[in-house]
């Protein structure tokens, strides 16, 4: 007697939905939060996977651009200023996050063309 009951089948090791989808973001937690938030009466099985994938992609995109901005400023640590520069210099991210204010982010350096000094032509005799 093996003590496993009738079937004798060994239960497979539990595998998270995040690892099945190849994601780092927690699919189970996102599913729970979608249910708890009362966004809809029912939540499909694919919805939290898709949402986790989108969130992971956006996070990776912003972090990559912010890392580039930090490296351009000769820094090894990403600060809110680098996030601001990364988002505002990217056309699509800027449009997506147009209504977002980043604390301690500052503004993009920009001088209007009319305020710049006029270029005078030097007269050569």
UniProtKB/Swiss-Prot annotation:
Pfam families, per database record: Histone, Histone_H2A_C
Residues recorded as bearing Phosphoserine in the entry: 2
CDD domains referenced in this protein's UniProt entry, alphabetically: HFD_H2A (cd00074)
Main location: nucleus
Residues bearing the modification N-acetylserine: 2
Secretion signal, residue range per the UniProt entry: none
Cross-link Glycyl lysine isopeptide (Lys-Gly) (interchain with G-Cter in ubiquitin) per UniProt, renumbered positions: 119
Sorted UniProt keywords: Acetylation, Chromosome, DNA-binding, Isopeptide bond, Nucleosome core, Nucleus, Phosphoprotein, Ubl conjugation
Gene Ontology MF: a single term: DNA binding
Domain of life from the UniProt record: Eukaryota
Subcellular location(s) per record: Nucleus; Chromosome
Region (Disordered): 1-21
Family: Belongs to the histone H2A family.
Subunit-structure text: The nucleosome is a histone octamer containing two molecules each of H2A, H2B, H3 and H4 assembled in one H3-H4 heterotetramer and two H2A-H2B heterodimers. The octamer wraps approximately 147 bp of DNA.
Role played: Core component of nucleosome. Nucleosomes wrap and compact DNA into chromatin, limiting DNA accessibility to the cellular machineries which require DNA as a template. Histones thereby play a central role in transcription regulation, DNA repair, DNA replication and chromosomal stability. DNA accessibility is regulated via a complex set of post-translational modifications of histones, also called histone code, and nucleosome remodeling.
Protein name (database record): Histone H2A, orphon
Organism name: Chironomus thummi thummi (Midge)
The organism's taxonomic lineage, starting at the top: Eukaryota, Metazoa, Ecdysozoa, Arthropoda, Hexapoda
């Amino acid at each position: 007697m093996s003590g496993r009951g009738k079937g004798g089948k060994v239960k497979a090791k539990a595998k998270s939905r995040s690892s099945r989808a190849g994601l780092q973001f927690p699919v189970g937690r996102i599913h729970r939060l979608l249910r708890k938030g009362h966004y809809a009466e029912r939540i499909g099985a694919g919805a939290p996977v898709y949402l986790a994938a989108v969130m992971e992609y956006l996070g990776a995109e912003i972090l990559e651009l912010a890392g580039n901005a930090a490296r351009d400023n000769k820094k090894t640590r990403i600060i809110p200023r680098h996030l601001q520069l990364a988002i505002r210099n990217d056309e699509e991210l800027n449009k997506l996050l147009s209504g977002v204010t980043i604390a301690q982010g500052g503004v993009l350096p920009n001088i209007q063309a009319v305020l710049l000094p006029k270029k005078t032509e030097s007269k050569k005799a």
